[in-house]
Amino acid sequence: MESGSDYSRRVFLGLTAAGAAGVAAGCSADATSGSGASPHTTAHKAASHHNVTENSLAGDPNWEIRHLGAPMAIVGYAGQASVLPGQPITLYVSTTARSFKVNAYRMGWYNGDRARLLWKSGSVKGHRQRAASMIHPTNTVQAVWGESLTVPTDDWPEGSYLLRLDAETGAQRYVPVTVRSASTTGRVVIKNGTATWQAYNTWGGYDLYNGPGGIADYSNRSLAVSLDRPYDANGAYMFLYHERKTIELAERMGLPLAYVTSMEIDAEPHLLDGASALITAGHDEYWSPPERAHVTAARNAGMNIAFMGANTMFRRTRIDGTRLGERRLVICYKTSYLQDPMYGKDNSLVTSDWREPPNPDPESSLTGTLYESNPTDADYIVASPDSWLFAKTGVHKGSKFTGLVGIEYDRVNPVYPVQRPIEVLSHSPLQCRGVNSYSDMAYYTHKSGAGVLDTGTMRWVACCNDLRLFGLTRKTSEFTRQVTSNVLHAFADGPAAAKYPARDNLGSMHEWPGDPIAGQHNLWPPVVL
């Protein structure tokens, strides 16, 4: 999203932060167990069997936060965004309570409980750690704290975890951690978008959008944000709102899953070798050049990709280290790219938006669609009802799902690079910033055999959560869950193009009066560099 123009989106994310735990509590899923896919490797079979076994175990419905308490009643962060099974996690905790405990939950299906308790600590002595400090000139907030405890992960399955900090006073916060996969061969890869989580993390008063003055303080924003600090709000709202529901569905279906974060994809060129699919959920805006290159190479080798949101890969980042280790700093200068130390040295690494100078490389060459703007609130309109993605939904051309498009949206834009053949599955008229436009859900197939889907709306995963804001209905939730299930089933079975080729229909999608594509109109106001 464009810096300095994000009021509606920040309000939306604030609603998310306040209600993420409650939203999670109200979720339901309609997908049936069993992947329906034909396993194509030994790794695929083994991972699928393990996932079915894991989710048959008893869950714990008491994983949710019941009481946040005061902002600093208890907060913490992990010294590792991810670990391999068996590697310890170091926790840094600050609390006003005399003691606290930690419960570690693996997120999944677990017969509707949606989490399993893997470990719990004894009572740990609590104390308030020092105030946050600032690194200049990038306005990088860091919490230079002493270690509070080490969490063992022996025998922990790979997956997305929430470590819940419970102060003796009743205050609670989450610390998200990924127990990552060493290999992704034959598996559907779930990506935890740690770079984007950190970009929106306002803990300490700064994120990549604003300084302590809030929405009017763009000029004082951070130019680099550190993982060496807690997350704001409940500690995990980006995960709970934008990612958890997709994980729940995939786990319930018994698919062979692997788990990684932004940081591993950035670091490891061959991490995705042999993967069936990559799933990025909800909001995955911040990508580094190595991450994009590694995902593109995997697509070119036949890996399917599902972008289950909008605004994906809009921002170009660099990943660097902090005092606690490698890949714990997300750098993004945005419109201040002339200040980026890489400017004039290696412009391919300058952290302007992907489509902007000094080295424009629009994200649509991978995503198929292109992020257009925000805010909007519109109905989702089906354009290609006989697509395999809409199986078991009963839709017809023009079927409408109220409020599904928002707050940010993508569109197929032929002014920029577009992969062909591409099939526009929904073509939803909307207004944004006083301009008429469309949101598109689109699917393309690549010569490698890969299938790539972009849902075109940031509310997709939220709708799977039975969210009732924005006019969303149970009918919409059932629709999004079924389509997501169809995608996961098909993509788990390997390169999708042969069985599910895209039927190019881009030429039948017409502009309407005031359309920004027809008028080559930029929806964003001018920004002073």
Question: Can you name each region flagged by the protein language model?
Answer:
Residues 1-7, 18-25:
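N-terminal secretory signal peptides
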Residues 23-42:
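C-terminal region of N-terminal signal peptides and the immediate post-cleavage residues
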Residues 50-53, 107-110, 115-149, 164-167, ...:
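Catalytic cores of eukaryotic secretory-pathway lumenal/extracellular enzymes that build
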Residues 87-91:
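Structural beta-strand segments of beta-rich domains
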Residues 95-100, 104-127, 169-271, 495, ...:
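Aromatic-Pro/Gly-enriched surface loop or interdomain linker
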Residues 100, 140-184:
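Extended acidic/polar, glycine-enriched regions
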Residues 129-140, 148-151, 156-157, 235-321, ...:
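Helical hinge/lid and interdomain linker segments adjacent to catalytic or ligand-binding clefts
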Residues 323-468, 472, 476-480:
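Glycine-rich, aromatic-lined ligand/substrate-binding cores of catalytic
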